[in-house]
């Protein structure tokens, strides 16, 4: 589907109504979260190097606060004008994750997976390629979206076998994320 969307002419990609993108605008209305000492140490390690390519593995038990740590890293990326991609292993995790994201940031991230409508795909494609949409949450296929200035890719639950595509073009989304970064 991504390839088909990419081949649509520019006229079809233009958004007729700008309000379709408004819900993705970065907002200042967000909750303030205090990091625990352990989370703060992990965040400092993630933030040590401000430029260049690097890969980190943030490991912790369920409920240990890993999500808040990488939300903080995404926040830093957004503050310098870059975009972020959060990969989830399964579509079923999207709704709950969207709520966490909106609660933390105060705005919606674009959600990309096989069940997204063609109209919404067009809006997201245009918004990411123009830089208007700053964050996308998605399944494996979101790796192929046209980000204008991608600054961070987070692979949530990177050990999950769902990241491995065994049909059609065979690839591992975790490995592709490293290559794309």
Pin down the residues of each PLM region.
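Accessory, non-ATPase domains that flank or precede helicase/AAA+ motor cores in DNA-metabolism machines
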Residues: 1-181
């Amino acid at each position: 589907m991504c390839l088909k969307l990419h081949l649509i002419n520019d006229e079809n990609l233009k958004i007729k109504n700008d309000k379709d993108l408004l819900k993705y605008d970065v907002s200042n209305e967000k909750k303030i979260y205090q990091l625990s000492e352990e989370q703060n140490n992990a965040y400092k390690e993630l933030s040590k190097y401000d430029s260049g390519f690097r890969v980190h593995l943030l490991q912790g038990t369920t409920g240990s606060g890993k999500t808040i740590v990488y939300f903080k890293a995404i926040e830093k990326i957004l503050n310098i004008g870059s975009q972020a991609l959060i990969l989830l292993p399964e579509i079923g995790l999207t709704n709950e994750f969207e709520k966490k994201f909106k609660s933390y940031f105060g705005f919606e991230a674009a959600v990309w997976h096989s069940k997204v409508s063609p109209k919404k795909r067009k809006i997201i494609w245009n918004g990411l390629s123009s830089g208007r949409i700053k964050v996308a949450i998605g399944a494996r296929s979101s790796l192929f979206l046209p980000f204008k200035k991608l600054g961070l890719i987070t692979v949530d639950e990177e050990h999950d076998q769902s990241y491995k595509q065994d049909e059609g073009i065979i690839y591992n989304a975790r490995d592709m994320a490293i290559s794309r970064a």
